[in-house]
Amino acid sequence: MKKKIKINFVDFFLGFDKEDNQFVNILRKRYDVEFSDKPDYIFYSTFGKRFLDYDCVKIYFTGECIVPDFNLCDYAMAYDYINFGDRYLRVPLYEVLHYQPKYKTLVDDTIPKTEKTAFCSFVV
């Protein structure tokens, strides 16, 4: 039996489908997902401030070049190369849109660490 979690999405772009998106699809593999006005976890983005009305774990996502404000969110997924321990995951928008098979690594709790194996130089 899967653990039940209550979630909601606010402040995303116009047309965002909160019941059918990559986040929910990943979560449904491990959890029984329930949408609630009183969620345990709120996912929010850069298109509003409604997330401030919630008293729960706040998870920020943006595909824009905006650094997450960890004074406002508990966890974040964004574009920038920053190190904030287990509270931050770099997820560029192109990964979300075009490389969905890589989600298996998120579901498996493992994210491959890329190693520098070659050198590339560009001369003009």
What residues fall within each predicted segment?
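N-terminal pre-catalytic "stem/leader" segment of glycosyltransferase-like enzymes
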Residues: 1-54, 69
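Catalytic core of nucleotide-activated saccharide and alditol-phosphate transferases
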Residues: 38-124
